[in-house]
Swiss-Prot record:
Belongs to the UPF0386 family. This is UPF0386 protein mll0189. Transmembrane segments: none annotated. It comes from Mesorhizobium japonicum (strain LMG 29417 / CECT 9101 / MAFF 303099). InterPro entries: YjhX_toxin. Pfam families: YjhX_toxin. The lineage of its organism: Bacteria, Pseudomonadati, Pseudomonadota, Alphaproteobacteria, Hyphomicrobiales.
Length: 99
């Protein structure tokens, strides 16, 4: 049985989290969007990530959405869905497109 110390497990989870964020940014850069639903108190209740073709993309939760917003990687205009910003495009690391 392999021995893991807390530090290596923590680093692995951060890497995984960063990889998910990069995947979402890359999908947004290709024309995807993040739609939000608010509750009665006008607070964000849930987020849904859609590809440019309208397919639901799993992996975006409230924490990741807030992180992207805090980094100014996504923004909304006129009450519409959240889309990638110029800052978000700078944060995207290039990724091979498998099409």
């Amino acid at each position: 049985m392999p021995h893991y110390n807390c530090h290596s497990v923590l680093c692995a989870s951060k890497r995984t989290r960063g990889a998910v964020g990069q995947r979402i940014l890359h999908m947004l850069a290709q024309g995807g969007r993040i739609e939000i639903e608010k509750n009665q108190k006008k607070r964000i209740a849930s987020v849904k990530c859609l590809t440019r073709d309208g397919w639901h993309h799993p992996g975006v939760d409230l924490d990741l959405f807030r992180k992207l917003k805090r980094k100014k990687a996504v923004s909304s205009s006129g009450g519409g869905p959240y889309r990638i910003t110029r800052r978000g495009l700078e944060l995207v690391r290039s990724e091979l497109d498998n099409r």
